[in-house]
Structures are given as structure tokens and as C-alpha cells.
């Protein structure tokens, strides 16, 4: 087991004991779980069927940044939780030391859907842009692969690696899942999707994972996506369209060029329902004929909403965009930290989100 890191800061253990009994309580549900030595808060929760908010599982995206109500945590040697406010922890990396209680309103008092591993048959592939393929898969209905809008699953590769993709469709119990796969030249999986994957092929998948989900609040919503970060946002829209209209929602989708908005007509249809659900495309590289918004997508949001104190933001896609949006909105536009929900797509290393 790696040696624990000594960190002199509130809410972080100064010294770890391998023999102590480690327990984590999720408030306000009151769920208490025993943690094995060296196991993270998130690993413990997922293993028991609970889904705290999370995304990358590597300490990079900060989607799992959670307030510590009492107790302390430690981190693996060499890991520094940069940018984490005092009194908070990254549950994907944090290890409870003794008794720890964290604030996680998304955790219910009853375990949620279990993680399963199953074969999945390719139903269809559709090239929707120069580098994005929409893949539909059929998981056996009796496999118990029950997901919620906003979650993702892993495809298990023959070399032992895995790649993660968000479901872009609404869950309906049919076992059908849809991915939006962007091809990267040096990727382990996406080039195969782009060049060779065909209907009838079999893949091995594991999931569902992720705590990215629409809250039960009645606050207005900003849906923020870059690139294929549109996929989990589309799942939220398809599942909760009426709720989002009732709350008031604005969908901002940023891409480089117009042709990169691979589901433009679908997104525009969402925004055709009047002021209660608007669609604002934003291009960073546009031609002369583009009359819409330009620049960075999170900056377009900031221009339109100087005060976000009474709103919620759901951001998906490039981690640089997600991080910039979080920093800008919380520091300069009064968005509460707990009102920023994210699913950052990390493209390399052990647990990538929407990886190549």
C-alpha cells in the first residue's frame, strides 16, 4: 500500500494509521460505510452501490469536490489536491482517516443501480461529422445494465485498457445505449470505431458509472457543452425536457467550426420551444457567414449571466473548458460551488472520460 502523504491543512490527515478503522458517512442521508485501508471514499461508495458525484476518478476534473463536515482524509503519496478549497476533499482520491462525514446530498439512503459487466452488440454506426461517430449498442435486457441520464460506461479493450463514453440517449429499460465517439489519431479505441466497427460486432462494457445527474432543485439551469460533451447533456434533455422547461434552461454548445456541431438540428429543435429552453451555439473558429456567437463558450455564458447566484450549471466536455467555467462562474459570477455539476472528458491515462 502506498505511504500516505502528510498535508498540513484543515480536513486533511496529518498522519495515517494502517490499523485504524476507517468509516465514511454521507450526509444528510446518514449512510455509513466501512473503508478498507488504502481505499478511496469514492471506491467505497461505488462498491456499495452508492453514486456520489464524480467523473474522471483521477483527481483532475474536481467533479467530486465535496465538503468535509467532520473528520479528516489523506491522499496517496505524490498527489496534491490543487485548487481544492479548505474543508473540502476530492472523494476519488481521498482516503478517510478514522470517522469522516462528508456532505453529499446526491447520495440517497438506499443503494442505487449496481455496476455490471456484459457483452454489447453493435446495432449501428453513423458518421455524423468528419471526426464523430454515433454508435448504438444493445446490452442484453437481462444483464441489469440500468443507467441514469448523465452516466457513462467503459468499453473493455483486449489489451486490458478501458475507455469511457457517456450515454447520449434516455434510459428506457431496453438495454440500448448510444455513444458519441470522437476519433483521435493515436487513440486505442476510437480509430477502430472510425474505420472498422460495424453492426453485429461485439464489445465488452462495464457500468454504469458517474454521479452527473440533474438535481431536484427548481433553479434555472445552464447546460454547457464542448465537443462530444454534448452527449450527456443530450441525455439530460431527452430524459428531463419538461422539467428543464419548467425550471428554465439555456443550452450553450461550443465547437470550433459549424460542421463540428454534429447534432445541430437536434439541439436547435430543443431551443425551438421559446424562452424556457434556449439553444446558443458558440464557435471559436468561424467563417464570414457565421452570424452567431463566437469565442470561448464559457465566456459567452458569463456575458449573458452576470449573476448566477440563483442558478445551476451542468458542464461537460474538455476539462480546460470545465475548469475555466468553474473558476469564472464561482469567483466572478456568484455561482455557489455546489451548484456547479460537471463531467470532464479526460483523454489519457487509466480512467479517461470519453477517451480516444
Language model regions located:
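Short, structured interface segments
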Residues: 88-112, 201-203
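Reductase modules of NAD(P)H-dependent flavoproteins
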Residues: 1-100, 248-356
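Histidine-anchored nucleotide/phosphate-binding helix
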Residues: 234-242
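A short, basic/flexible loop-to-alpha-helix module at the beginning of a structural domain
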Residues: 206-219
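Short, conserved phosphate/pyrophosphate- and ester-handling motifs at nucleotide-, phospho-/glycolipid
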Residues: 150, 229, 318
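Short, surface-exposed secondary-structure boundary micro-motifs
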Residues: 69-72, 105-107, 158, 208
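Ferredoxin-reductase
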Residues: 114-202, 220, 255-257, 282-286
